Amino acid sequence: SKLCPAVTVECGRPGEPHGVEHAREFLESCLHLSEIPSHPPAHSDLDLFHTVATVKIPDYVRFGFGDSSYSGGSLDLCLVDDLDQLNFQEIPAGTSFGEVCSEMVDHFEVWNEMGEDVGDHFFLVEDGQLRTKKRVMPSMLTLDEEVIRQDCFCYLMERLPY
């Protein structure tokens, strides 16, 4: 065959029963297809996104999660404490990721697929809040500070026309 289709199924956090069940149902339905349809799915049946950037928090930025009043001024960036709820949801421009608590922070480090810094394309500081500049879908957004420091904060996806 000239083609070998492959997919990645994102189903939530490891070990969550709903994610495991969702993956199982998807694979079962694929395995029981009598044939691969020759027509594309209906537009209403498919949301197509692609990863456009990796978001990192610079090493010099002291960050935490929750209300800045609890930090005693020790943080540069106070991220919203339930940001992981935005995972795999398309969010509008202007969505706050947290409060900027020092002048050291003007945006996240955001790198596109070519390794170019595109932070100013996706984020801005407005009224003391670090906000999205455009409609995006965060993926793999984590609240684990060790993962954020060792790997990344999240990825950003944008809708592909279909």
Where are these regions (language model features)?
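Structured catalytic-domain cores with a bias toward divalent-metal coordination
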Residues: 1-162
